[in-house]
């Protein structure tokens, strides 16, 4: 799968998610979309990242932006994670990695000398016309949600 390019149309997807049941990117035209990919529910870095987006949610909403978190975890796992952390946004479940592959976020990783394929923490900003306007790869959690918000504010 080719890596999506900033300036081009964002890869369109349909997926299952918390709350709404399903999400179809093509039906979200007219809204800015923040799509953040994270490795695993209820782990320290992923929890902090979600909390940071949660804490800035009202500011994102004021800018007309929807936030979606996405990982390979099950919908049940996402529902528990969302509830426990009081996330006001939806989490997309991608167990077959279809959306992950469209956005080219599955990468070889290493932990304790063991190599495996996993989600490379990444965020994509999609404008109201469905165009990919910014991407962040190999995201460091600290300050990231604020950086995404600042980028949206600068789009005006």
Where are the regions a protein language model picked out?
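Chalcogenol-based redox active-site neighborhoods
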Residues: 1-156
């Amino acid at each position: 799968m080719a890596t999506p390019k900033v300036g081009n149309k964002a890869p369109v997807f349909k997926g299952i998610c918390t709350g709404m049941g399903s999400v179809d990117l093509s039906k979200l035209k007219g809204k800015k979309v923040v799509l953040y990919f994270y490795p695993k529910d209820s782990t320290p870095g992923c929890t902090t990242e979600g909390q940071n987006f949660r804490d800035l949610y009202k500011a994102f909403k004021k800018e007309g932006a929807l936030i979606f978190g996405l990982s390979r975890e099950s919908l049940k796992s996402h529902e528990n994670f969302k509830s426990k952390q009081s996330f006001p946004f939806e989490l997309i479940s991608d167990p077959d990695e279809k959306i992950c592959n469209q956005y080219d976020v599955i990468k070889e990783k290493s932990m304790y000398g063991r190599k495996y394929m996993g989600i490379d923490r990444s965020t994509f900003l999609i404008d109201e016309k469905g165009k990919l306007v910014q991407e962040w790869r190999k995201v460091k959690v600290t300050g990231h949600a604020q950086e995404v918000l600042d980028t949206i504010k600068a789009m005006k």
